[in-house]
């Protein structure tokens, strides 16, 4: 089962870069609900295109949460794929330094943070939706306020995590390969 998925994912590299470009070129500071929700709209369009069921969980002050589900084996606890759509960059940053790519590297607001992880999670969901074969359901949870401590989405995250067999957060490592294990302060 793994080989067709890997082959398909390898064929999707251009589409992955296109989705990353689209996400990076949307200003999405944590306090810019409209911008964070525009990133969500782009992701839900991706899910619609791949016929992946999803729902938007409205949150008043910060970006809404998005939950996408790919069915798996009956009765098994889901695998949770987490990611956040917000960045620390002020609104207007995209105009100063939009997405670019050179020599196999991408640049722009959110590229060294979570936006590539959103692409990874979206394509994992799409691959397993297309090919099936995962023994557990997959749940993608895409929140909008992580950079400020998840004040609005914490309850949503906790509820999904409590149901899950395990959870993955696809936030990248530092350029050194070190990983972040906690927030500052």
List PLM regions with ranges:
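Phosphate-binding glycine-rich loops and adjacent basic patches that engage nucleotide phosphates
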Residues: 1-11, 81-90, 115-120, 168-181
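Short, hinge-like loop/turn segments at secondary-structure boundaries
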Residues: 74-75, 98-99, 157-159, 184-185
């Amino acid at each position: 089962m793994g080989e067709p998925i890997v082959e398909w994912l390898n064929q999707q590299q251009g589409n992955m870069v296109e989705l990353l470009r689209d996400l990076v070129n949307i200003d999405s500071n944590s306090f810019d609900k409209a911008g964070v929700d525009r990133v969500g709209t782009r992701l839900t369009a991706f899910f619609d295109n791949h016929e992946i069921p999803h729902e938007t969980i409205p949150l008043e002050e910060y970006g809404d949460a998005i939950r996408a589900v790919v069915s798996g084996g009956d009765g098994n606890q889901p695998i949770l794929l987490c990611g956040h759509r917000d960045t620390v960059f002020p609104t207007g940053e995209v105009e100063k330094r939009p997405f670019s790519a050179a020599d196999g590297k991408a640049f722009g607001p959110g590229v060294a943070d979570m936006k590539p992880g959103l692409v990874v999670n979206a394509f994992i969901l799409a691959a397993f939706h297309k090919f099936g074969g995962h023994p557990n359901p997959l749940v993608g949870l895409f929140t909008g306020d992580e950079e400020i401590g998840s004040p609005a989405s914490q309850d949503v995250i906790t509820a999904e995590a409590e149901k899950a067999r395990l959870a993955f957060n696809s936030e990248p490592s530092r350029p050194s390969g070190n990983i972040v294990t906690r927030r500052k302060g």
